[in-house]
Regions:
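Cysteine-cluster motifs in flexible loop/terminal segments that predominantly coordinate metals
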Residues: 1-47
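Active-site/binding-pocket entry motifs
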Residues: 9, 30-36, 141-142, 159-160, ...
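Positively charged, proline/Ser/Thr-rich regional signature most characteristic
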Residues: 11, 15-25, 136-151
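Short acidic/His/Gly/Ser-rich catalytic and metal-binding motifs that mark active-site loops
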Residues: 36-37, 82-86, 144-145
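Rossmann-like dinucleotide/flavin-binding elements
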Residues: 44-78, 117-130, 137-147, 157-208, ...
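Rossmann-like dinucleotide-binding cores of NAD(P)H-dependent redox enzymes
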Residues: 75-112, 183-233
Length: 304
């Protein structure tokens, strides 16, 4: 089965294209759903040894499809576990299905006998030899903002995956989906989030399911979360942030126990060059979502 997409919220369109699946649906996890004639796993004509840099969802999906096609993938993962940033994305109390997805990928990688080299960070793919192709799946890193005190912010990984103590009043710098989900998780813990968002609406994103975003917007309103739209943080002090409304010019302060960097992510830096043909998948190409990560990984694995 596929997941139906909602079309628009306050003029923000949903760009999940449906034209090649009879305008019915697309599945984030399985590109072949309802599109079996277009997307099929075809055996490779010439098996290749492929290095995959990064063991997140994109890296694991690439490895699994490559293995099914007869290639020999090897995953290089800089930490001691698979999952990448999706570990953080699935860390919230209401993300049990996402946790199960990581478990499924790990199990499938193990069942397929795919080689994994943990605690191995590749900073220059030029050092890799003996591979016919290289797939870079290194994901993204938090965006930074050049304002005084920015170093005081915590990342989503520190908040969600590492469970850093944050106190009661938690200020989110940015009101995208990640911030709203994390804020909702804090609400469930009895804490009091505050959101400062530069745009005129929360989750002003054109590639997110409206069912999810509408629920989060409603949750912020229902729980009376202070939301400051059209605003930007200009300075971060000890327990207090200076905020400016970009439309009216009004300035004010917001007190907090901790502040979270929720202004988004940027692709990881390039890793050099290699004589082997190189591909990229996931957020290191462009920041996307679970579907864009899995679909691009699937397509790249089919192109090798």
């Amino acid at each position: 089965n596929g997941c139906f997409n909602f079309a628009k919220y306050k003029g923000t369109s949903n760009l999940q294209k449906l034209d090649d699946s009879l305008h019915l649906a697309r599945c984030a996890l399985n590109p072949t759903t309802m599109q079996h004639n277009k997307y099929k796993i075809v055996p490779a004509k010439s098996p290749k040894k492929v290095a995959i840099i990064g063991g997140g969802i994109g890296g694991m999906e690439t490895a699994l499809v490559l293995k099914q096609r007869g290639h020999n993938p090897v995953i290089f993962e800089k930490t001691d576990k698979l999952g990448g940033l999706f570990i953080t994305a699935s860390a919230m109390s209401f993300k049990e299905n996402d946790k199960q997805l990581i478990t499924w990928y790990k199990r499938e990688v193990e069942k397929q006998g795919i080689e994994i080299r943990f605690n191995t960070e590749i900073n220059d793919i030029g050092t890799l030899g003996g591979y016919d192709a290289i797939v870079i799946a290194t994901g993204s890193v938090p965006r930074k903002m050049p304002i005084p005190g920015f170093e005081k912010t915590l990342t989503f990984t520190q908040l969600l995956a590492e469970k850093a103590p944050v106190g009661d009043k938690v200020l989110f710098m940015g009101g995208g989906q990640s911030s709203c989900e994390a804020a909702y998780d804090l609400i469930l813990q009895g804490k009091h989030p505050i959101i400062v968002e530069f745009k005129d609406d929360l989750i002003a994103d054109n590639a997110t399911c409206l069912a999810n975003t509408s629920y989060l917007r409603d949750a912020m309103e229902y729980h009376k979360v202070p939301v400051h739209l059209n605003c930007t943080i200009t300075n971060i002090g000890d327990g207090v942030a200076n905020v400016k409304n970009v439309k009216t010019g009004e300035t004010f302060t917001v007190e907090f126990d901790n502040i979270i960097n929720g202004i988004g992510f940027v692709p990881t830096p390039a890793l050099g060059k290699n004589k082997a043909k190189t591909y990229k998948v996931g957020d290191c190409v462009a920041i996307g979502n679970l579907r864009t990560v899995i679909w691009r990984a699937w397509q790249v694995a089919m192109d090798i």
